[in-house]
Every structure is written in C-alpha cells, then in structure tokens.
Design a protein with these regions (language model features):
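Generic recognition of stable, solvent-exposed alpha-helical segments in well-folded globular domains
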Residues: 15, 57-60, 84-88, 117, ...
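Short, solvent-exposed helix-loop connector elements
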Residues: 125-140, 158-166, 183, 201
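Protein C-terminal end segments and domain termini
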Residues: 143, 174-184, 194-253
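Mobile-element integrase/transposase regions
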Residues: 1-36, 44
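Charged, gly/pro-enriched flexible loop segments at helix/strand junctions
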Residues: 145-182
Length: 253
C-alpha cells in the first residue's frame, strides 16, 4: 500500500479504525455496526453507526467521521476485514494522500487504541443488545453526536510512556491525564491557532452533566425500542431453596 507519510504515533492525524457489531448474540440477518475512529496521539475519537457493514456504508461513515476531526488525517490503520480492505477506500486514500496500513494477521494488539474505545465508548454506552431497525440506527447516531463531546472534551486519558520488565515484574510509566481537547491544544506543530480558537469556543458552553443526562435519555429510548421487539420472554427457572423444596435432602447413612 502507498505510504504518503511515515507513520508517527506522536503526531496528530494517524488514526485507527474498527467496527463493533450490534448483533445481540444473534448474527443472523442484517444488524447495525458502529465505526470508531481514534487518533493515536491525542485520543480524539469520532463514532458513527451504519445499517450493516457493507463497504458503501462503512466508506461513507469513514469519510464523515474523519472530516469531523479538528486536524487533518494523515494515515489510517484498519484490521483485515473486507469492509476496510477494498478498492474504494484505497483509491480514496491515494487521492487524499493518506497512508493506509492494516494490522498484522493474528496480531490482536495492533489496534489496541481503537479497541479500547470500542469498549469504553460503544459497549459501555449502548451495551450488547441487537440493533437492526432504522429507528435504532437514528438513535445510535444521535447518542454519538453527544458522546463525542464528553469523550473529546471531558474524558481524561493517560498515555503509556515506558514499560520496563524486571524479572517477572513489569513497571509502566504514564503521562499526566489529559483530555483529547487538552492534547489538541497542547500540540505545537500540527493544529492551527484558528482551529484551537474554534475548539475553545466550542468547549466553553458545554455542560458535561447536561450532556450525560441527554445521553441517558436517548439510551433509555433505545433500550425501550430494542426490548419491545423481543416481546414478553418467559421468566428463567428459579432453583428452589433447600427449605422450600418438596423433598428435603437427607444425609446418607
């Protein structure tokens, strides 16, 4: 794959991308997926949900998400799924002079940054339910429009600076916690002053508690929709307590 810029995790603009499936334990039929796009240097993350993982939906979501970053995207790293490894995305990366790399087959640590966001943002916010309707898709994206504000402006993160093994013990050193917003403002070589001014204006009126309440309200609405599809489920059998059973256990003589 064409390399337009040397991959540099310390520079804003190099992102990892990944999909999270919302099959709810049932992989049959069509269901929604959520795309996470995470900048390695700053932790800035944009999230978009799509109706399924067809290339055209995923590609459109990638373009929309990367356009929302407060700095230019320089490189994209994905796993080996066909929703990412295809001619359309590669051609676009070449046209935009984006370095496009993919993880090594069988190496689960290559996408560690974005996979952490899959759990912290997607699973902790909307859980493991099955989402497969247009109404649910709309709610998911309304949630992400709010969640991005919490994650990027108010979610402090720590970055690993060093890892030292001494015998069986591993010692890790982290930097001071900082939000993606703060890391973008601290950048001295990539992000322009105008962008930083715009981000400060965007940040000033934000109320994280109010945003969280809005997310909770939308999440409750989403849960109502998905549970309504399931109908009334039989209650699981409850094992009788020893004193409630019809025949008391006896000790063998």
């Amino acid at each position: 794959m064409r390399t337009w810029a040397e991959w540099d995790d310390a520079v804003p603009g190099f992102v990892e991308i990944d999909l999270v499936g919302h099959e709810g334990g049932n992989s049959r039929g069509e269901f929604c997926f959520t795309l996470d796009v995470t900048d390695i240097a700053t932790g800035w993350t944009e999230t978009r949900s799509v109706r399924n993982k067809a290339q055209k939906w995923v590609f459109a979501a990638i373009k929309d998400a990367t356009a929302a970053f407060p700095f230019a995207i320089l490189g994209i790293d994905s796993d080996n799924g066909s929703e990412f490894i295809n001619r359309e995305l590669l051609t676009w990366c070449e046209q935009e002079n984006l370095t496009f790399t993919r993880s090594r087959s069988g190496n689960k640590n290559d996408g560690a940054h974005v996979e952490q966001k899959n759990w912290h943002i997607v699973r902790q916010t909307v859980g493991y339910h099955r989402y497969d309707t247009a109404a649910e898709l709309d709610l998911l994206n309304r949630i992400w429009a709010l969640q991005r504000l919490l994650t990027n402006h108010f979610g402090p993160q720590q970055k690993l600076l060093a890892k030292v093994r001494t015998g069986a013990k591993i010692s890790k050193t982290y930097d001071r916690p900082a939000t993606p917003f703060q890391r973008v403002l601290a950048d001295t070589g990539t992000v322009s002053r105008d962008v930083k001014k715009r981000l400060r204006r965007e940040n000033k009126p934000l109320n994280p508690a109010a945003i969280q309440r809005q997310i909770q309200a939308l999440s409750a609405e989403l849960l109502t929709l998905t549970t309504a599809k399931q109908g009334t489920k039989p209650q699981p059998a409850i094992r009788a307590k020893p004193n409630d059973s019809t025949k008391q256990p006896q000790r063998a003589s």
